[in-house]
Amino acid sequence: MNFKKLPKIELHCHLDGSLRVDTILDIAKKDNIHLPSYNKKELINYVSIMDDCNSLDEYLNKFFIPNKVMQTKENLKRIAFELLEDVAADNVKYIEVRFAPLLHVEKGLNIEEIIESVLEGIKEAEKLYDIKGNLILGCMRNMDIPSAFEVVKKGAKFIGKGVVAIDLCAGEEPHFPGKYIEVLKLAKECGYRITIHAGEAGVGENVLEAINLLNAERIGHGIYIKDCAEAYKLVKEKNIPLEVCPTSNLHTKAFESYETHPFMDFLKDGIKVTINTDNMTVSNTTITKELEMLNKFCGLSIGDYKILYLNAVEASFASSETKEVLKSYVKEITA
C-alpha cells in the first residue's frame, strides 16, 4: 500500500520539534549562535531521538537547540514556511501547527510579532503549495499562570486570521487542569477552540478533567484513557477526538512497541482517533512513516485509513469551506 500518495491531515505537530537540521545549522552560522556541533550527523543526535529515550521529560530536552534559532521574525517565518513545504511534499492537505509564543521572546520580540511571523510563513506556503494551515497557540505548563493569560489575551486578535485554538503543553502532572480553569474560560470567551495535552504521561484522569473542567474539544495524545474507565467512557460518549502520535508515544516510553499501542483498540471501539507526528524532527518521522508502521505492526488497512482521514476532517478546527475541500480528497484513498 502506497501511503505516500494518500491525502493526509496533521492535527498535532509542534513547530519547534519539526525543524530541518540544515536550517538549524544555517541560522546558527548566520546569527552566530553556539551549537554543541556544527556537523550535521552529530547535531542530529542533539535534536532527534536516535536510539533510546526514557521519559517525556528526556524527550522534551530535544527542543532546547531548535528554540535557540527561533528568536527573530525572519527565522520564525522561514521555519513555519519550511514545515508546510515539507508536509506538502508528504501530501498533507491540511495542518494545524502548534507552538508556544513565549519560547521565542529571548531577543526582544513581543507575542504579537512572534505569532504574526509564523502566520506569514504559513500563508506564504499556502500560496505555493496545495496545502492549508492554521495555528494553535500553546501555553506552557512549566510557566506561571499569568503567562498563560498573556498568550490568550495577546493572541486573540489573530483569531480568524490563522489562529484557531489554544493548547496547554509541556510536562504533565496529575490534576493539572484545575489550575487553568480561568485561563481556558477566558480563551473560550475570546473565541478560541480548545485542545489540551492530557493522558500522555500515564495519567488518564487528566483527560477527564481536561474535558470537564477546561471544555477540551480535542485531546492531545489521550492514550492513558486506557487506564481510566471514566475518562474512556466520557471520550467515547462525547465523541472527543484524540490526537494520537504513535512514534512519539514509543519514544516517551508510554508504550514499548507499536503492537502494544492501544490505537487499534480505540479505533475498533469507535473512539475518534486521528494519527499525527507530534514532532517530525525529534521523532524522526512523517505522517507517511506513522501510517507505514501502523500498517506493518498493527494491520492498518485502507478502510481503517479512510476512517482516520474523515475523523481528522471532522476533528479539525478548519472552516466549513476547508472541510468540504478536504472531504473531496476521500475519493483518492484507494489501495
Swiss-Prot record:
Known catalytic reactions: adenosine + H2O + H(+) = inosine + NH4(+); 2'-deoxyadenosine + H2O + H(+) = 2'-deoxyinosine + NH4(+)
Active site: E200 (proton donor)
Example GO BP: nucleotide metabolic process
EC number of this enzyme: 3.5.4.4
Transmembrane segments: none
Pfam families: A_deaminase (PF00962)
Site (Important for catalytic activity) residue list: H221
Cofactor(s) recorded in Swiss-Prot or TrEMBL: Zn(2+)
Keywords, ordered alphabetically: Hydrolase, Metal-binding, Nucleotide metabolism, Zinc
GO CC annotations, alphabetized: cytosol
EC class (word): hydrolase
One Gene Ontology MF term: zinc ion binding
Protein residues bound to substrate: H14, D16
Binding residue positions for Zn(2+): H12, H14, H197, D278
Cofactor binding note of this UniProt entry: Binds 1 zinc ion per subunit.
Record-stated family: Belongs to the metallo-dependent hydrolases superfamily. Adenosine and AMP deaminases family. Adenosine deaminase subfamily.
Biological role: Catalyzes the hydrolytic deamination of adenosine and 2-deoxyadenosine.
PANTHER family: ADENOSINE DEAMINASE
Annotated protein name in UniProt: Adenosine deaminase
Source organism of the structure: Clostridium botulinum (strain Loch Maree / Type A3)
Phylogenetic placement of the source organism: Bacteria, Bacillati, Bacillota, Clostridia, Eubacteriales
